[in-house]
């Protein structure tokens, strides 16, 4: 947020790429800072957020205290599968199939994958949400899809501080 404010540019879109609360709880704060910005996600991510938001807020609020969302935002469903930032195309991929609720963004001009929860950087992978063999196979297939892009930069959905993103 500080980089956007310092740039003097107008933030138009806040994209939520996953239905886990660590991906959307902060949207409330960003929306307060950038009230003109639209908070968007895919249909599958919104469906998961909508189904679980009340329970996630009830569980996490006591643990987060003053940092818990007061009015969590349910993102709007984006139209299409692309966004633009400063004229650069950003593709939202992985929006169909078993992992439609775990999309990723691909920036073709710089060959970058950004923010996919399937990718962990220097952390043990979280497997509690993929316990069935079919879910693990879908995860492996998505990783194969990501690898086939031959990205020059990969920003994991979760990473330890200092993780190299190249």
Language-model-derived ranges and their functions:
Residues 12-16, 38-42, 91, 104, ...:
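Structural recognition of the beta-strand scaffold that forms the well-ordered cores
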Residues 47-101, 109, 147-150:
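Metallo-beta-lactamase
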Residues 106, 112, 137-166:
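Divalent-metal (often Zn2+) His-rich catalytic cores of metallo-beta-lactamase-fold enzymes
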Residues 1, 18-19, 44, 117-118, ...:
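Active-site metal-binding loops of divalent metal-dependent hydrolases
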Residues 57, 122-133:
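Acidic/histidine-rich helix-loop elements
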Residues 1-6, 104-107, 111-117:
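Conserved beta-strand hairpin/beta-sheet module of binuclear metal-dependent hydrolase folds
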């Amino acid at each position: 947020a500080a980089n956007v404010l310092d740039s003097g540019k107008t933030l138009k879109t806040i994209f939520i790429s996953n239905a886990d609360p660590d991906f959307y709880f902060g949207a409330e704060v960003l929306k307060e800072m950038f009230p003109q910005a639209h908070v968007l996600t895919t249909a599958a991510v919104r469906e998961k957020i909508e189904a679980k938001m009340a329970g996630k807020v009830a569980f996490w609020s006591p643990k987060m205290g003053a940092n818990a969302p007061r009015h969590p935002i349910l993102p709007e469903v984006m139209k299409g599968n692309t966004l633009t930032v400063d004229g650069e195309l950003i593709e939202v991929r992985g929006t169909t199939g078993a992992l439609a609720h775990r999309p990723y963004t691909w920036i073709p001009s710089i060959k970058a994958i950004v923010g996919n929860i399937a990718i962990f950087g220097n952390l043990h992978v979280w497997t509690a949400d993929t316990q069935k063999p079919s879910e693990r196979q879908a995860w492996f297939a998505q990783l194969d899809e990501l690898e086939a892009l031959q990205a020059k930069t990969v920003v994991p959905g979760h990473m330890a501080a200092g993780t190299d993103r190249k």
